[in-house]
Amino acid sequence: MSKIIGIDLGTTNSCVTVLEGDEPKVIQNPEGSRTTPSVVAFKNGETQVGEVAKRQAITNPNTVQSIKRHMGTDYKVDIEGKSYTPQEISAMILQNLKNTAESYLGEKVDKAVITVPAYFNDAERQATKDAGKIAGLEVERIINEPTAAALAYGLDKTDKDEKVLVFDLGGGTFDVSILELGDGVFEVLSTAGDNKLGGDDFDQVIIDYLVAEFKKENGVDLSQDKMALQRLKDAAEKAKKDLSGVSQTQISLPFISAGENGPLHLEVNLTRSKFEELSDSLIRRTMEPTRQAMKDAGLTNSDIDEVILVGGSTRIPAVQEAVKKEIGKEPNKGVNPDEVVAMGAAIQGGVITGDVKDVVLLDVTPLSLGIEILGGRMNTLIERNTTIPTSKSQIYSTAVDNQPSVDVHVLQGERPMAADNKTLGRFQLTDIPPAERGKPQIEVTFDIDKNGIVNVTAKDLGTNKEQRITIQSSSSLSDEEIDRMVKDAEVNAEADKKRREEVDLRNEADSLVFQVEKTLTDLGENIGEEDKKSAEEKKDALKTALEGQDIEDIKSKKEELEKVIQELSAKVYEQAAQQQQQAQGANAGQNNDSTVEDAEFKEVKDDDKK
């Protein structure tokens, strides 16, 4: 079976891994980094992903960041006259990671396990799966990030029985999961979280503070300046990271704006205590889901054996301190918070291929599932934290006499009223025979698969007529849309390849022109006038071709110049060889000269010197 790669598709950074033997290995990207920024930029028809896209975000408005926050919604990004869905942008990041894995493995990769926040709903999970498909990946499994982290942490501890709390604060999402580990079984007991809380929010409180300070000092509102905001975002992210290691940091942004008297500069000294004050409400927001997960698992602090911190934002000292205070236990710092999730995904890939044995993963659904009933209430069929895959059925009936059809409104959430929960989908069961209300027997069945994706069936037990749907939210893509996006991705990949080849060809041709000019100068009088003229003509022809857009013309002119320079080099080499032979002949003649005399010498002993 071909390799299944593990991918942590993050809000801020992404990571790709593969199982080598029985150990997960993080694959470095072409820049040598173990994580890749989840950033996509568009410039002159070219798509850039990762570090190169992030570097030019300040000057390029067509740069997309933190797209994960929009997964499962109908959000669109309009760039250069074209609209992109979050699935398409995510697919570009996945395609980049896929290429990195293929370069490392030296073989085609078409299967992956992709991680998602535990608190992702059905629409967000389906969108992630669609993104994988667009990128040319068969998504073998969608796995929850805290579960993946526990898998990586506990793989070599299968002989222990432990209850582990995974606190996962990433770039844009927050999850907390509690798992029980023992005898190779990884069972999720509960999960809770907030999909709108992460490192981006910690950056934002610093940005807001800098904007307020600058406005107070200079009367200029930087929040209205896009380029200034991007510079502030980069500076805030750097300051946040700095304050994990030092107690204060200097934020210096020269020429950030201009006033009546000339350029304005931003200079702010930010202390760790000030940052903690600014971000206090965010840290407090992480505590409620933590308490909820503990309550749902039926555990007390003394039951928790280990606390694992996952996600780059858990490096913030105030976050670590808050977790320690809440659980009463020092967090385990033996795992890399940026890589552990992707490593767990690779292990899950190994479980699927059979390379990892005696490991069983029992995950849960993060939110309750049900349907709307009379009075606009939600009737729950599957409670949150139910182990998946699972199936649950319930009998319903009609609300009025002779009702010919029933509308099934599928919901996900914890609120009692249907309107307060998320609509996953709607469908209709028709042709119900006329009967008094309450008589027809309508069986509604919910199925949740191993990826946490929902299927719903409604069946009239009187006629055995059945209606079944896989939940499609308003943001879900049809098969036709996915196929079109797959083709677009393939075409773009081919176009990007051609563009790279064109750039390489132009660079090689440019280098050849420089090399020929240098060679002609170095040879000077040692080259015939005719040969020199031929080389000059071919060189000028290539320079002219480089000014145009005809790639084939550049290629042929380059080949012609290469041929001339090879012939020229051969002639110069022959001349040099002849000159060397003549020089050796002259030296040999000098060695046979009759004027050479033998010298006599007399040995002088030490005694003779006295």
From Swiss-Prot:
Acts as a chaperone. Induction: By stress conditions e.g. heat shock. Keywords: ATP-binding, Chaperone, Nucleotide-binding, Phosphoprotein, Stress response. InterPro entries: ATPase_NBD, Chaperone_DnaK, Heat_shock_70_CS, HSP70_C_sf, HSP70_peptide-bd_sf, Hsp_70_fam. PANTHER family: HEAT SHOCK PROTEIN 70KDA. Residues 529-542, 599-610 have a biased composition (Basic and acidic residues). Residues 525-544, 576-610 are annotated as: Disordered. NCBIfam families: PRK00290.1, prok_dnaK. Pfam families: HSP70 (PF00012). Residues 576-592 have a biased composition (Low complexity). Belongs to the heat shock protein 70 family. The modification Phosphothreonine is found at residue 173. It comes from the Bacteria. One of its GO terms (biological process) is protein refolding. The gene is dnaK. This is Chaperone protein DnaK. The lineage of its organism: Bacteria, Bacillati, Bacillota, Bacilli, Bacillales. GO terms for molecular function: ATP binding; ATP hydrolysis activity; ATP-dependent protein folding chaperone; heat shock protein binding; protein folding chaperone; unfolded protein binding.
